[in-house]
C-alpha cells in the first residue's frame, strides 16, 4: 500500500504527490483524512483522473475538500471505488463510495465490485424485442417501452419527469416483482426522501436498492454515482440471472458534473462549455446498460432538457442510445393534461406491428394522424374560427380534443395532488378505448368526461355524473 501527500487543492480536484515507486492507476481510489467531514481517519475518497508526471497524480474528490491541507497523508488503496453488491444491498440507501446513508448500520455484503466495468461482449448480448407494460395509457399506446431496453424521459424544468419516474417505479416494480435499483444523480434530497418513504409504504423497498448522490454533493460524486448504481444492477443481472429495473434521475446531472470537473482537469471545453469527452463518457455508461443471455437491465432515465432546447449537446448525446423516448411538453402541461407527454414527438422502436400486433399499431398510428390533422387545423381556427371548418374537420377537432384529454391519467403517486385514486390501465383496455373514440362511438359525450380517467368505461361513468 503506497502513501503520498496532498500537493494542492483546487475545489473538488486534489493533486497528490507520491515519492518514488509506482503511481496509483487511473480510476483507482485513494483515501485521505478530512476533519471537516468527521473524526474518522482516511474518511475522504479521491479517484485518480490524470498522471501529471514527477510523481504527481490529479484526483477528483467524492466529498467536500474544505479543511484539506497541503502535506496531508494520502493512502493508495490499490483498487477502484467499490460498491456493496448482492441481496444485502436491497432495502438500503448507499452513497457513491458504497457507504450506507440510511442510518441502519453497515451493509454486510459478501462481495464488493469495482464501479468501472467493461460492457458485455456482442456475443453475450440478447436482442429479442418484447413490450414492457407500464399501465400508463399514453406510453403503452404511442411509445411502448422495451423489456431490457433503454428509455428516456425528456423534459424541461417542472413538467413532471420525477413524478412520471416515480409512477413507473410504482407500476412496474409492483407488477414486475423482480429487483430494482434507483440511482439519484444530482437531484433534490427532498425527492429522494419522498421516494424512500413512498417505497416503504408500498412494500417495494425490500426489493429495491437506492444509490444517492444529491445536488449538494461535489461534482466527483455526481459524476460517479450512476456507475455505482449500475454496478449494483449488473450484479443482479450477471450473478443472480435476474431481470433488473434500473431507474436514473437525472442523467443530465451526470453530464453536468462531468462538465464541472472537466475544466478543473485542464481540458479545453467543447460546444456550450461541455467536456470534450461527453460522447465517450455517455457511451461508457450506456453500453453497460444492456440485456445479456443471463438476464436483463431495463433502464428508465429522466433527462433534463436545459431551457427546453433539445439541440443542447447533453440531451442530444443521450438520444442516440435510447430505444424509446417519452417527451414531456410544457404546452401540454399548461393545458393541465398530465402526464404531459407529447403524443407526436415521443418515439419507440417497438412501435412495429410485428412486435405489438396489427391492432395496437393501427390504433396508435390513427391517433397520431388525427392529432396531427388537428394541429394543422389550429392555424385556420386561430384566424377564421371553428365555424369556417367543414363538418368532417369539426369532427376531427372534437375527437382530437377528447383523445388529448383521454391521454391524461390519474397517478397513484399524485393522489394527494389530484384527489383522485390512481389508475393502472391494461394495454387491451387502452387500445379498445382509443379505437372507440376514433370510430365515433362517444361523439355525444362531453370532453370533460375523458379528462383524468382510466378506461373508456370510467369516462362513460363520469359523463353520466356530469349530466346528472
Curated annotation (Swiss-Prot):
**Which keywords accompany this UniProt record?**
ATP synthesis, ATP-binding, Cell inner membrane, Cell membrane, CF(1), Hydrogen ion transport, Ion transport, Membrane, Nucleotide-binding, Translocase, Transport
Keyword Cell membrane present in the record's keywords: the answer is yes
Q: Which reaction does it catalyse?
A: ATP + H2O + 4 H(+)(in) = ADP + phosphate + 5 H(+)(out)
Q: Name one Pfam family in it.
A: ATP-synt_ab
Query: CDD domains, alphabetically?
Result: ATP-synt_F1_beta_C, ATP-synt_F1_beta_N, F1-ATPase_beta_CD
Detail the disulphide connectivity of this chain as listed in its UniProt entry. Answer: none
Query: Which locations, inside or outside the cell, does it occupy?
Result: Cell inner membrane
Q: Where does ATP bind?
A: 155-162
State the annotated membrane topology for this chain: Peripheral membrane protein
Q: Per the UniProt record, which EC number(s) apply here? A: 7.1.2.2
Task: Show the InterPro entries listed in the entry.
Answer: AAA+_ATPase, ATP-synt_VA_C, ATP_synth_F1_bsu, ATPase_a/bsu_AS, ATPase_alpha/beta_chains, ATPase_F1/V1/A1_a/bsu_N, ATPase_F1/V1/A1_a/bsu_N_sf, ATPase_F1/V1/A1_a/bsu_nucl-bd
Q: Which NCBIfam families match?
A: atpD
What family is this protein classified in? Answer: Belongs to the ATPase alpha/beta chains family.
Q: What is this protein called?
A: ATP synthase subunit beta
**Species annotation:** Bdellovibrio bacteriovorus (strain ATCC 15356 / DSM 50701 / NCIMB 9529 / HD100)
